[in-house]
Amino acid sequence: MSLLSDLINLDLSETTEKIIAEYIWIGGSGLDLRSKARTLPGPVTDPSQLPKWNYDGSSTGQAPGEDSEVIIYPQAIFKDPFRRGNNILVMCDAYTPAGEPIPTNKRHAAAKIFSHPDVVAEVPWYGIEQEYTLLQKDINWPLGWPVGGFPGPQGPYYCGAGADKAFGRDIVDSHYKACLYAGINISGINGEVMPGQWEFQVGPSVGISAGDEIWVARYILERITEVAGVVLSFDPKPIKGDWNGAGAHTNYSTKSMREDGGYEVILKAIEKLGKKHKEHIAAYGEGNERRLTGRHETADINTFLWGVANRGASIRVGRDTEKAGKGYFEDRRPSSNMDPYVVTSMIADTTILWKP
């Protein structure tokens, strides 16, 4: 293995200008991530310098076998924490050969919303809290849990330390540093309420970049768990019973909300979100009804409720925001398996563009 490690860590810059670009795209389920690599003649700093590419869509559930070619367009570049040097990760979105976005390409519609002059003027900021569960390979049971059994009840695990409370910290810290290296605006990590469950936060990120950064952070985490021999789950309720689910709480503010008098803007935005509750819930992730039960720090899926410092609400406003009279709010409804392009653009569309 030491020889393999030596070769994997070869510094290409000593012998060649060429770099490796890992093209990443979203697969047919809308949640699975795919990637493949290609050699480029030299360092690249902007997606516009990168060639488009294609893949076999019939093997990802995104095209029929008789017309299987799907074209991927490079959209965002990050440093590659695995190959390092000048090598890069490239977040792409997918199109037909005729240039139409394929159904699983949610980035295209999101980019239209984020490029609208009214949205651009408001400089929307997002901070996304991505929860996930680490599972033991082969048995799909949470890391640190006895096989076929259960650990002690929730309580000591949230932000806990110790071999009987924190399971998978090496994976979590590796991911944290890898994201910082890649240029992702990861702002923190913590152990979650259910043992084997963790969270990382990305943001504040502006507009479409929030979606790009969450997807690439997910990809990096998939790669790290692959090396560790652990399965990564974004299921919003991986274990039935008295255990917390997994969400992707989305913190949001606009320029108007961050300025003096912003609290009134926040209240108007929350009112609009309440009027479109059903539409948002429908787009906020698969299986969310198993998580949004009104228990375990959630609001009931059929009820829209907001409150200050209330973690049982659909929308939570922080005490600091209330006191300052400006700031941000947190949409607690999105599930861990949500598409960040959909959620972020929908919040902007409802709160900025929609005129009820």
Swiss-Prot record:
Gene Ontology biological-process annotations: glutamine biosynthetic process
Record bears the keyword Transmembrane helix: no
Region annotation Disordered: where it falls in the sequence: 38-66
Signal peptide residue numbers: none
Keywords: ATP-binding, Cytoplasm, Ligase, Nitrogen fixation, Nucleotide-binding
Primary location: cytoplasm
Chemical reaction(s) catalysed: L-glutamate + NH4(+) + ATP = L-glutamine + ADP + phosphate + H(+)
Annotated compartments: Cytoplasm
Domain GS catalytic: 106-356
Domain named GS beta-grasp: residues: 19-99
A GO CC term assigned to this protein in UniProt: cytoplasm
Top-rank taxon, per record: Eukaryota
InterPro entries for the chain: Gln_synt_N, Gln_synt_N_sf, Gln_synth/guanido_kin_cat_dom, Gln_synth_cat_dom, Gln_synth_gly_rich_site, Gln_synth_N_conserv_site, Glutamine_Synthetase
Enzyme Commission number, as recorded: 6.3.1.2
Note: Irreversibly inhibited by the herbicide L-phosphinothricin (PPT).
Sequence similarity: Belongs to the glutamine synthetase family.
Assembly information from the UniProt record: Homooctamer.
Protein known as: Glutamine synthetase cytosolic isozyme
